């Protein structure tokens, strides 16, 4: 198993958040367009929250601390 580098792990989430933010909207109409946009908004929020987390190891568990302030 590869060794986990937490800083690189979090950086990948920041990169994913930026990619979601920059990608264009495909040619969709109606409900499909609305669903796609909502999904992209959720993806961005999820990736950006994890990407800005502070981390620690506590009793063999990775602990991510995510501030809810912007």
Predicted regions and their residues:
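Compositionally biased, non-globular sequence tracts
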Residues: 1-70
């Amino acid at each position: 198993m590869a060794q986990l580098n937490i800083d690189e792990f979090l950086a990948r989430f920041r990169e994913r958040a930026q990619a979601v933010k920059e990608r264009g909207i495909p040619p969709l109409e109606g409900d499909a367009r609305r669903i796609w946009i909502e999904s992209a908004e959720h993806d961005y929020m999820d990736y950006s929250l994890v990407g800005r987390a502070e981390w620690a190891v506590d009793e063999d568990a990775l602990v991510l601390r995510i501030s809810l302030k912007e």
